[in-house]
Amino acid sequence: MGSGASAVEAKEKIAAASDDEIKACIANLSADQRAKLVNAMQLAKSGGGSGGGSSLKKLRIDAVDIAGKRIFMRCDFNVPQDKADPSKITNTQRIDAALPTIIHALQKGCKSVVLCSHLGRPDGNCVEKFSLAPVAKCLEEKLSAAASFTVPVKLLGAGGRFDTKEVEDECASPANGSVFLLENCRFALEEEGKGVDKDGNKVKADKDAIKAFRASIAKLADIFCSDAFGTAHRDHSSMMGDGFPIKCSGFLVAKELEAFGQVLDNPARPLLAILGGAKVSDKIQLIKNLLDKVDMMIVGGGMAFTFLKVINGVNIGGSLFDEEGAKIVQEIMEKAKEKSVEIILPCDFVVSSKFGEDGEIKNADMESGIPDGFMGLDCGPKSIEANAAAVAKAKTIIWNGPMGVFEMASFEAGTKTLMDNVVEATKGKVVSVIGGGDTATACKKYGTEDKVTHCSTGGGASLELLEGKDLPGVKALDEA
């Protein structure tokens, strides 16, 4: 980011200065200068960037002259299909999310839009049930409705791969305003670089074949546009834009990057991270990275029981205990203390004799512990109050992982009430970002997707971004 260099410089200067030098410096500062110093120190704490050193400020499609140009647009049309009839799409949300970028390109007079996506896991084989033919039909209906006239969407490479001379010729000189949808890019082994053969054996794509496949993509258009945040953490061929002179983001990806930039690059403070999920070991990198950035951290969900057993010796009964994750709990707590991060753990619980609502359900607390034969499936009322208090203090919130088994009504209070708290805070101008995955599912369940600042569409991508990793599909794009 633009602040990255200044943050590094500030961090180095702060680290090099002695206590006496810092005190002498502060004593001679004006109020305005003190405010700037505090800001620099906050930048130093946050690392001044999103992670991996890669900027999240990328060239957007609305900053590119696309009139008369052919646009290759990588989308995410990995839509849910009816199990009995795969030709039926059961939820068009991902198609709807791509429409603003497609419509913008057409309105700005582009020559053609060449859409590309994966669907399912065909593992480098042409699998009929994973054909994008139903997506082409749905896209045509939605684009035509938006335009009030028929907008044909032609599927290229139908029944096979799209890296053919026939497809290349079709895209070479299309009629103005043409919309093409390439057949499932994962039908090609060279897309992911690996897959299975007809006998089910694992195979890898030849490096030269991958290079040729990427070159074939670059022949289809003049400008590369990525609008598939959900696969931005994969260095798959159609995500990288190799061979394109201009590589920009679509509106969906731009929105994701802007939202995470607000949280990770010099956020308003206090910054609160809410982390849930089952295993500590699955979130080690996430926790460690966020401890360098946040002021408060709520640890809930199943992994909270591992923390409580290690730190306080609490009897957790049959609750989830992560043996591997337990090994680094003390290290995490020591880092939190070193970084002055307040860790908020549950102090009471809703427990059940079964993993379900048909067991004996009761409350437990730290003093009583969780009886043998019972497992913690949600946090209790006092924990809910403590979580609400943390949200009330925050100016920026990032949330990844539920507080309990919210799919069951008896164990949803921790997650549902916290969601209500976050929504209320958002009304008060707090920046709130939901980091995809199960928390995004909770947003959908409670109808709060539009009531938080941003609800991410990328589970794995958002997690890796929060872990401080570069996303190949983002790093490949041109800087703004």
Language model regions located:
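Long, low-complexity, highly charged intrinsically disordered regions that are enriched for acidic
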Residues: A5-G51
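Active-site loop-to-helix "anion-binding N-cap" substructures in soluble metabolic enzymes
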Residues: S50-A480
